[in-house]
Amino acid sequence: MIRGLHYMCWYRQDWNYHPSMPMKRLQQVQDIVNMNGNLLLWSCLGSAAIGIQYLDKEANEAIPPRLRFYGYLNDKEFIAECGKRGITASAVIWKAQLWEFPAEFSEDESELLALNKLRGVGKKGWIGMRELSTDRYPKIFPSIKTFFPKGLKDSDGKPVKDFLKGFMAVTLDGNPIFSRWLMVPGHDHYCYSPCGNKPVFREYLRKEIEIMIDAGAPVVHIDEFDAQLLAAMSGGCFCKDCLKLFREYLKKNPSAETDDLDLDRFDYRAFLKKKGYTDKDLTDPDMDKRLAIPLLPAFIRFHIASIEPGVIDIAEHVRAYSLKKTGKRAKVTANLYHCDPHGEAVRKHCDLIIGEKADIKLRQDGYYRFGHAFFGGKEGSFIEDPGPYIHEIMRDIDAGKNDSYILFMLEPLAHGFNIAIPYGGWLQNQRQDSFYPPAEAERRMGAWLKEHESLFTNRFAAKTAVLYDQRSAMDCELTKGLNRRHLDVGFPVFHGLCQSLCDARMLYNVLYVSPDEPLTAKRLAAYKQIVLPDAYSLPESEVRMLRAWQKKGGRVVSVGKVDPRLADTEFRHRAFPELSAHLAQVGSIVAAQDVEGLGLSLHKRGRGYALHLVNYRMNSGTRVIETIPRAEFTLGWKPKKAAVHSFPASDTKARLEGNVLTVENLSIYTVVELG
């Protein structure tokens, strides 16, 4: 079992300062061991977004004796110490970050007196991408020529001296685009967004990768893999490379809008400026107004289409360079965020599925079932995106109450998903602090999971499958979900149905269907019922496959926006509970008594099953999850025995009478092993 850690190690009661994570200590490595962790996310080697020289120091600098006394390590040493203990540390590429920080220097600029956090001493200046690329402080940092002896050139063959200017994305009006969500409130520093379509920036990333691999990084993680979409949502990017590539995109994807355009010389910036558009129009909060701008939907699609080539460029260099230098291929991951549809093209290039779960709530088993399908059979782990419920968990921990945290960590495992342990997890600078686990509770939970790992097979038993049509989801994201990325990405019928079925304690699986993961007869054969929520973009071959499966006795139920080719399968409902009741007619392998605040999943295990039961009965006053006195289940088979495993440890009991299972005194998390 992967036990990921959201391992940014930001300091408590301080802001989260990207892009360079704090220096690690040996005790922090031991903490990972104590919690049975084995995969560190966002853990080291992130500072190339300040400058390549800064990254080199982060990897290789000598540690002063005073810090050695407390076990401090440079990042190369940190990676090695993790490796000795079977722990995989990931280096991180920030694709949406170019930083400039205030600094203070001695008068002759031979000594750095302060950086980011100023002291009011010495001579003021800046350290960042501009200064390090132009050798502004040669007495402090090595020359940029050490890393790029021949310099860098843009796509026209012209030398790029100022990397900040040469890399940054620009708006319609020629302004820089800022990655403002990373900047600390009230701080005088700046985070610019680069353009991933610039060949010169990709060359810089390749050198960054080489330093990471030379430092021993076994995994290179791409954060902000979709920086081009982020730029498009901020009024860009209109650099010369994007304008060239957009012309080629329109040639390959013509439409009625392009019929009268000379695509050999078309300049989208000049086209919009001539029509009177400005940055204000391209960043209008009303998404419908934005999408009504001529060719803007195509421009957004172009930027999304450019994401995959950028990831391929990184992935190929990571694997080729690491194989050459170490004899082994380093792994590649990307922050696939909320399992958004536009991440589909990148999934296949990732060795592990890593992301950032948004909109964390007390209960979200519906999402986790979808997330398991998004994993596509690969292993992975998601960090938490900070929000109100995360802050509530932190308040509970501060008060010595850990039930909400335990539920937060265990609930996804019931459904084949994985949330990383927050170890100095970032809070998006919503408050001046970072997220750490309750240490003793986490150590006990890690030991319990290791002992009971065989009960988490992630092979789920169900008669019903909910089909996730990635093509339809992508269409919804582009037309109504671009400003709902942290919620339902414009696909509420699918996500609402999944949660409704979980609330009704109905077992089901999600069938993730996409160009890279097509629907097959073998996938359909495992089920008696297929539900199609807003699935209107399946290719004809897959519709025919559904019809053939239906003729053999399968039940197809379409809801939401229904494909005209499947109109006869539509079921109209006024509310999700009505739909859930209709779907329950096919029966279930496990029929649960109506018990408030109970979730379940059924893992196939050898010749038996493991029934996972999740208790959501959080008392809002005491912040304690109250015991469920009794729950009864009618099983579709007659087990010979039932063994109970609970966390936290409790007096939970189970008994069998034929095919009826009764469980008493359910703790937060209970697994009933049915043999």
Spans of model-derived segments:
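Carbohydrate-binding surfaces of carbohydrate-active enzymes
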Residues: 279-284, 305-341, 347-349, 355-675
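Polysaccharide-binding and catalytic clefts of secreted carbohydrate-active enzymes
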Residues: 31, 120-365, 370, 516
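Active-site mouth loops of central-metabolism enzymes
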Residues: 5-24, 189-204, 392-401
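Hydrophobic faces of well-ordered beta-strands that scaffold small-molecule active sites
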Residues: 3-9, 40-42, 89-91, 220-222, ...
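Aromatic-lined carbohydrate-binding/catalytic grooves of carbohydrate-active enzymes
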Residues: 29-76, 97-116, 227-242, 296, ...
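Catalytic domains of carbohydrate-active enzymes, especially glycoside hydrolases
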Residues: 23-53, 77, 215-219, 408-415, ...
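Active-site beta-loop-alpha junctions enriched in small/polar residues
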Residues: 8-14, 45-47, 94-98, 225-227, ...
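Aromatic- and glycine-enriched glycan-recognition loops and surfaces
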Residues: 14-33, 57-86, 199-206, 306-313, ...
